[in-house]
């Protein structure tokens, strides 16, 4: 189970709604993923209700919507978008994204912390996308964020867990869920994040641009389940030297003694 604020989810796979070829393909992939929490950019939402072709089916699937502030370059812009999202979609949940750099889409730590503090005061359940900075993640936790979402690699890059060492520190120190967001490009990488101790992952590009997004969504679902189960079961410790799984010499000694007799 994944516990975020006052909500319990059975799936540890969060998904996005961007880059799919058609809305129908997106909905089919999201259903195959088993995801119960899906993020959507506010800039894609028709505030006049014209986007119900997407929103209504999502709600019918029992999927909780997590609007995000992608496109915001400052704390003020993100706060404005958050207020619009709450009014338009009737949710106080928010994925906070502030990335002024259009080439690498790296999150602005100063503006993110500033916006998070204000939005928490306004009653939002804030899940901030941030760099894999243990100090920043702890500060975001301290101002009241419901989870932290450190990046594995730049958004859409499919590079995997490039920030592995820092993610380990964040996971060790966090008292809120850690959701690895951005850069995960293969189901094996998602499983790796869960085995490492992450509470969940968010995947969009790797599913949306796959040759078969529905099959890829199912692959990620199985990988996340496997990674989480492996972590729960207890992974064996790594060793430099070999450790035999059965006695190496007992059988030979028994045979030698039998031959002498």
Curated annotation (Swiss-Prot):
<dbReference type="GO" id="GO:0009229">
    <property type="term" value="P:thiamine diphosphate biosynthetic process"/>
</dbReference>
<dbReference type="InterPro" id="IPR013785">
    <property type="entry name" value="Aldolase_TIM"/>
</dbReference>
<comment type="similarity">
    <text>Belongs to the ThiG family.</text>
</comment>
<feature type="binding site">
    <location>
        <begin position="182"/>
        <end position="183"/>
    </location>
    <ligand>
        <name>1-deoxy-D-xylulose 5-phosphate</name>
    </ligand>
</feature>
<keyword id="KW-0963">Cytoplasm</keyword>
<keyword id="KW-0808">Transferase</keyword>
<dbReference type="Pfam" id="PF05690">
    <property type="entry name" value="ThiG"/>
</dbReference>
<dbReference type="GO" id="GO:1990107">
    <property type="term" value="F:thiazole synthase activity"/>
</dbReference>
<dbReference type="InterPro" id="IPR033983">
    <property type="entry name" value="Thiazole_synthase_ThiG"/>
</dbReference>
<dbReference type="InterPro" id="IPR008867">
    <property type="entry name" value="ThiG"/>
</dbReference>
<comment type="pathway">
    <text>Cofactor biosynthesis; thiamine diphosphate biosynthesis.</text>
</comment>
<feature type="active site" description="Schiff-base intermediate with DXP">
    <location>
        <position position="95"/>
    </location>
</feature>
<feature type="binding site">
    <location>
        <position position="156"/>
    </location>
    <ligand>
        <name>1-deoxy-D-xylulose 5-phosphate</name>
    </ligand>
</feature>
<protein>
    <recommendedName>
        <fullName>Thiazole synthase</fullName>
        <ecNumber>2.8.1.10</ecNumber>
    </recommendedName>
</protein>
<dbReference type="GO" id="GO:0005737">
    <property type="term" value="C:cytoplasm"/>
</dbReference>
<comment type="function">
    <text>Catalyzes the rearrangement of 1-deoxy-D-xylulose 5-phosphate (DXP) to produce the thiazole phosphate moiety of thiamine. Sulfur is provided by the thiocarboxylate moiety of the carrier protein ThiS. In vitro, sulfur can be provided by H(2)S.</text>
</comment>
<comment type="subunit">
    <text>Homotetramer. Forms heterodimers with either ThiH or ThiS.</text>
</comment>
<keyword id="KW-0784">Thiamine biosynthesis</keyword>
<feature type="binding site">
    <location>
        <begin position="204"/>
        <end position="205"/>
    </location>
    <ligand>
        <name>1-deoxy-D-xylulose 5-phosphate</name>
    </ligand>
</feature>
<keyword id="KW-0704">Schiff base</keyword>
């Amino acid at each position: 189970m994944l516990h975020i604020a006052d909500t319990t989810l059975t799936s540890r796979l969060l998904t996005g709604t961007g880059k799919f070829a058609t809305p129908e393909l997106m909905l089919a992939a999201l259903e195959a993923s088993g995801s119960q929490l899906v993020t959507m950019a506010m800039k894609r939402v028709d505030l006049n209700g014209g986007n119900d072709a997407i929103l209504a089916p999502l709600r019918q699937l029992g999927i909780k919507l997590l609007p995000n502030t992608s496109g915001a370059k400052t704390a003020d812009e993100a706060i404005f978008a958050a207020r619009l999202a709450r009014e338009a979609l009737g949710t106080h949940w928010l994925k906070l994204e502030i990335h002024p750099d259009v080439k690498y889409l790296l999150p602005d730590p100063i503006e993110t912390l500033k916006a998070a503090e204000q939005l928490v005061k306004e009653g939002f359940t804030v899940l901030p996308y941030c760099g894999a900075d243990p100090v920043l993640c702890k500060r975001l936790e301290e101002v009241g964020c419901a989870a932290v979402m450190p990046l594995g690699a730049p958004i859409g890059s499919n590079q995997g867990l490039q920030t592995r060492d820092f993610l380990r520190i964040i996971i060790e120190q966090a008292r809120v869920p850690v959701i690895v967001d951005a850069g995960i490009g293969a189901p094996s990488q998602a499983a790796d994040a869960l085995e490492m101790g992450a509470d969940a992952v968010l995947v969009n590009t790797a599913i949306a641009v796959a040759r078969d997004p529905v099959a890829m969504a199912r692959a990620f679902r199985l990988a996340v389940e496997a990674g989480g189960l492996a972590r729960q079961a207890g992974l064996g410790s790594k060793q430099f030297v070999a450790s035999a799984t059965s006695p190496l010499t007992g059988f030979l000694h028994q045979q030698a003694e039998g031959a002498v007799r």
